[in-house]
Structure formats: C-alpha cells, structure tokens
Amino acid sequence: MYAIIKNGGKQYKVKEGEVVKLEKFDLGIGEKVEFDTVLMGQTAAGEVKIGAPTVAGAKVVGEVVEQGRHKKVKIMKFRRRKHSMKQQGHRQYFTAVKVSSISL
C-alpha cells in the first residue's frame, strides 16, 4: 500500500511506517500532520486509484520526527583565463515525517 502526495511543489511516494524528508514546515517534534493532496494511491488489495487532480476523501497521516538541514551543496563559479573563482554553499531545511496511516 502506497500513496503519492504533493508537498512544497514536489511529489513524494510514501508507504506506511516509512520516514520521508519533506520541505520544512513549522510543527514541533511529535505533532501530527495530515496531507489531503493525495494524487494517486494503491490499496492493500492492489487496486490503484488515480486522482483528477486528487483522490477524493483520501488522506495520509504522519508524525513529525525530526527538523534539520540537509548536507551542504557547494556551488562553484569559475571564470576561465581570469584566475578568478567564487565558491558558495547552501543547506536546505527539512522536516522528517513518519507515515502512520494511509486511507484511500
């Protein structure tokens, strides 16, 4: 059983009991979160439900387990023949959510 949800302009495939790192949102650790924008899902019986654009009445419930930052991404700008370069880094914030139930 799985579902594809939309969060932060991205789509994520989630399963029950799985921990997924999503875009940061302001909730404390241990708080419940619901996702109503389920785009597609498969039931335990194997039936696939596709939304237009979302599956009606479907929701994914999870619990926030961690707030943090991803690994650093290094950006390097190099100007050829000028002996000049610029280096910059970025660390994106995330919220880790453990999926507790999927209802389609």
From Swiss-Prot:
Record's keyword annotation contains Ribonucleoprotein: yes
Coiled-coil residue windows: none
One Pfam family hit: Ribosomal_L21p
InterPro entries, sorted: bL21-like (IPR028909), bL21-like_sf (IPR036164), Ribosomal_bL21 (IPR001787), Ribosomal_bL21_CS (IPR018258)
Annotated GO biological process: translation
Domain of life: Bacteria
Keywords: Ribonucleoprotein, Ribosomal protein, RNA-binding, rRNA-binding
UniProt keyword annotation of Ribonucleoprotein present: yes
Signal peptide (residue range): none
CC per GO annotation: cytoplasm; ribonucleoprotein complex; ribosome
Any GO MF annotation of the entry: rRNA binding
Biological function: This protein binds to 23S rRNA in the presence of protein L20.
Subunit: Part of the 50S ribosomal subunit. Contacts protein L20.
Family of this protein: Belongs to the bacterial ribosomal protein bL21 family.
Protein name, entry field: Large ribosomal subunit protein bL21
Gene giving rise to this polypeptide: rplU
